[in-house]
């Protein structure tokens, strides 16, 4: 399984996507909990 999509490995894309999703969800819940998310 050495097939890569262009120059970026698939596992790297998955890792970055996972971090971004977790970060966005964390920011959303933190903003909602602290009251800053009411303006979004």
UniProtKB/Swiss-Prot annotation:
The chain crosses the membrane at residues 8-28. Pfam families: PsbJ (PF01788). It is found in: Plastid, Chloroplast thylakoid membrane. Keywords: Chloroplast, Membrane, Photosynthesis, Photosystem II, Plastid, Reaction center, Thylakoid, Transmembrane, Transmembrane helix. It is a single-pass membrane protein. One of its GO terms (biological process) is photosynthesis. Its main location: plastid. GO terms for cellular component: chloroplast thylakoid membrane; photosystem II reaction center. Signal peptide: none annotated. One of the components of the core complex of photosystem II (PSII). PSII is a light-driven water:plastoquinone oxidoreductase that uses light energy to abstract electrons from H(2)O, generating O(2) and a proton gradient subsequently used for ATP formation. It consists of a core antenna complex that captures photons, and an electron transfer chain that converts photonic excitation into a charge separation. Belongs to the PsbJ family. PANTHER family: PHOTOSYSTEM II REACTION CENTER PROTEIN J. PSII is composed of 1 copy each of membrane proteins PsbA, PsbB, PsbC, PsbD, PsbE, PsbF, PsbH, PsbI, PsbJ, PsbK, PsbL, PsbM, PsbT, PsbX, PsbY, PsbZ, Psb30/Ycf12, at least 3 peripheral proteins of the oxygen-evolving complex and a large number of cofactors. It forms dimeric complexes. This is Photosystem II reaction center protein J. It comes from Anthoceros angustus.
């Amino acid at each position: 399984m050495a097939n890569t999509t262009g120059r970026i490995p698939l596992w790297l894309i998955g890792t970055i996507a996972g971090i971004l999703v977790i970060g966005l969800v964390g920011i959303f819940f933190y903003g909602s909990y602290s009251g800053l998310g009411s303006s979004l």
